[in-house]
């Protein structure tokens, strides 16, 4: 302590002097607060000045705290960015913020990114609950995302309710929801892992993939052990079987819709042309192929909870190469590693067979009954909660081009979908399938939050005779 005290009397860089003062303060049983007062002078570097003010505000008397508060007030309202940054950082070290809280709203709008990021850390350090929504909003902007994430993680379990609310809000972007799941993984407490595993069992698609990756990345395999402790091997096998059954539904759709490009329901159009009818069918087929790839990826992620990560990764790499010799090597690795009940069905996914053959090999998990293309499309829409937004939109585009009827329930539910381009696709379908019903619905959609959708509504109202905004 004496060595540090002697060091603090020398000419030091501001950052070193600030650390020395903080060390002395934390080490001394009865620190001399008056010794810090000279550092409050405006001529002192803001790093040191802010540190001294924060230390005084921790244990000073009323007059000393008032003096330190005034120093920080001047720093927070200073024209120079560095003054405001150091003043803001000092707030995070001070236990007493009453007189300075009124500056927080302005600091949240400060032109300096460094000030705004520093303030997010202050909100977390001081547990200023009234400003927690600002931490969540910070996740939505690239410039403040990392600072907001670190600040939220520092809250530990206190942040969990906020993060769950954000992660489960379907009206938020996938990126923002991913940040919420990521924060839960970085918090890493028993309670946070409970939330992640619970949602793993009920989530689908992108959300399930994100949760799996987050759990796998947790240090010391805490996520892997957390999953095995909570749902066990049988639970993981159930999740793999769910993915296999979903892939079976995709194969059924690809098989039943394979003839759509020459299907006779494209009125007055050459079935061999590259017109919209053929294009929309191909768009849906590509979207379904993408869903198959995503589900396959989730199967590999799930296997990493059961088998050595390097082994599963090697198999995935070889199979993804597409080269026959490497694919065979990948299948051999899986064959020697995997021992789940549905092993043969799983390996079947990676073999060089047609969709029809693969579908036949999944018979122990799902019974395939051929359907007409229109019935298969309606069946897909019954599975809409498992489809990606783009695949769902493609279903409506194909129904519109092919003049296939969909149920009112399917149409109305998807008209309330959180993604704008899905609502666009439903409106375009209704314009062809039921103009009268569309005309009744349009007035309710004029204030759609998506500008493209609201513009589409206005155009349709003018075209169908419903008028525009008044």
Regions found by a protein language model. Give the residues of each.
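Structural detector for internal amphipathic alpha-helices that build alpha-solenoid repeat scaffolds
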Residues: 1, 6-7, 15-29, 38, ...
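Amphipathic alpha-helical scaffolding segments comprising HEAT/armadillo-like alpha-solenoid repeats
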Residues: 1-9, 29-41, 62-75, 96-109, ...
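Short inter-helical turns and helix N-cap capping residues of alpha-solenoid HEAT/ARM repeat scaffolds
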Residues: 12-13, 44-45, 79-80, 111-112, ...
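Catalytic cores of nucleotide-enabled group-transfer and carboxylate-activating enzymes in metabolic
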Residues: 155, 200-209, 226-251, 256, ...
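Intrinsically disordered, low-complexity terminal tails and inter-domain linkers enriched
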Residues: 262-274
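A cross-kingdom feature marking charged/low-complexity
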Residues: 287-295, 351-391, 453
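Alpha-helical scaffold segments of alpha-solenoid architecture
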Residues: 307, 319-328, 332-355
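Short amphipathic alpha-helical surface patches that serve as generic macromolecular interface elements
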Residues: 392, 408, 420-427, 439
């Amino acid at each position: 302590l004496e060595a540090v005290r002697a060091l603090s009397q020398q000419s030091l860089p501001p950052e070193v002097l600030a650390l020395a003062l903080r060390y002395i303060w934390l080490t001394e049983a009865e620190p001399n607060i008056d010794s810090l007062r000279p550092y409050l002078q405006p001529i002192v570097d803001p790093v040191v000045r802010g540190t001294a003010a924060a230390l005084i505000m921790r244990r000073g008397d009323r007059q000393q705290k008032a003096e330190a508060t005034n120093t920080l007030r001047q720093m927070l309202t200073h024209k120079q960015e560095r003054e405001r940054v150091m003043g803001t950082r000092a707030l995070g070290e001070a236990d007493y913020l009453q007189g300075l809280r009124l500056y927080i709203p302005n600091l949240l709008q400060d032109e300096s990114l460094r000030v705004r990021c520093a303030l997010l850390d202050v909100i977390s350090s001081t547990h200023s609950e009234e400003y927690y929504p600002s931490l969540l909003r910070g996740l939505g902007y690239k410039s403040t995302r990392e600072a907001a994430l670190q600040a939220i993680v520092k809250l530990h379990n206190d942040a969990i309710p906020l993060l769950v609310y954000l992660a489960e809000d379907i009206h938020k972007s996938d990126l923002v929801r991913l940040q919420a799941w990521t924060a839960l993984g970085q918090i890493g407490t028993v309670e946070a892992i409970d939330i992640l595993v619970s949602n793993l069992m009920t989530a689908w698609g992108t959300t399930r993939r994100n949760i799996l990756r987050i759990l796998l990345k947790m240090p010391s395999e805490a996520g892997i052990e957390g999953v095995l402790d909570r749902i066990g091997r049988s639970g993981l096998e159930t999740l793999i079987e769910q993915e296999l059954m979903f892939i079976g539904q995709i194969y059924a759709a690809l098989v039943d819709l394979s003839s759509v490009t020459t299907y006779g329901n494209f009125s007055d159009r050459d079935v061999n042309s590259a017109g919209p009818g053929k294009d929309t069918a191909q768009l849906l087929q590509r979207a379904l192929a993408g869903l198959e790839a995503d589900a396959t990826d989730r199967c590999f992620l799930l296997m990493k909870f059961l088998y050595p990560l390097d082994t599963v990764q090697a198999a995935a790499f070889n199979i993804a190469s597409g080269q026959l010799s490497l694919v065979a090597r990948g299948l051999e690795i899986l064959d020697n590693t995997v021992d789940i009940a549905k092993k043969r069905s799983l390996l079947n996914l990676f073999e060089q067979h047609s969709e029809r053959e693969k579908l036949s090999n999944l018979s122990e998990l799902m019974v395939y009954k051929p359907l007409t293309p229109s019935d298969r499309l309606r069946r897909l829409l019954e599975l809409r909660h498992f489809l990606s937004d783009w695949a769902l939109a493609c279903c409506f585009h194909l129904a519109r081009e092919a003049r296939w009827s969909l149920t009112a329930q399917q149409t109305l539910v998807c008209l309330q979908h959180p993604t704008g381009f899905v609502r666009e696709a439903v409106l375009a379908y209704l314009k062809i399938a039921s103009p009268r019903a569309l005309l009744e619905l349009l007035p309710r959609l004029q204030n759609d939050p998506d500008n493209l959708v609201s513009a589409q509504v206005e155009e349709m109202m003018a075209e169908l005779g419903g008028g525009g905004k008044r």
